[in-house]
Amino acid sequence: VFCYTFYIMMLTAEKQALLDFLNSHLALATLVGFIILCFWLIDLIALKTKAFASYRKYYEPVSRYALPIGFFLTLFSTIMSLVYSDYLGVLPCGLCWFQRIFIYSMMFIFGVAWYKNDRKVFDYILTLSIAGLIVALYHQYLQMGYSELIPCPAIASTVNCDKPTFMEYGFVTFPFMAVVTFGYTIMLSLTAKMFNK
């Protein structure tokens, strides 16, 4: 239903309706994804204190399919960022570009690794994800109204980093979506490394 509605709105060129649709639905998906991510993190931490055998049946499939899951997650993020900027005209700020660099890079790394079935890439993915997460958390910090610790890399023709383009539920912004995406790639990498037997 989401894909069909998205496709019809793109064909009919109702850009404002499409923007409202994407903002509300992606914000809800991000919120649900964040809740799942929190439970996943708590569960992986709990694995350190419990026997691995009882949880292995849940995490082995995630580990086995971590490359395609990561590829499609970063591909979706890439497509949505390009739809927002190139089709809907929502200009990215300087910090958004840094986050895009990390996500776009991971999409290609996941894609090539999946094609070659190379499971040794998770150290690289983890490094890119942590760096991207730091940028996204700082960007979210700015957009929640706190003062700059480091100047925004905005130039005259781009958007200012501390002005949210949209905000749903009082805290879901583009940087928060990136936080959740980087969180998932971190958890995928950790799960793949823990259960890569």
Positions of PLM-derived features:
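Cys/His-coordinated zinc-binding microdomains
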Residues: 97
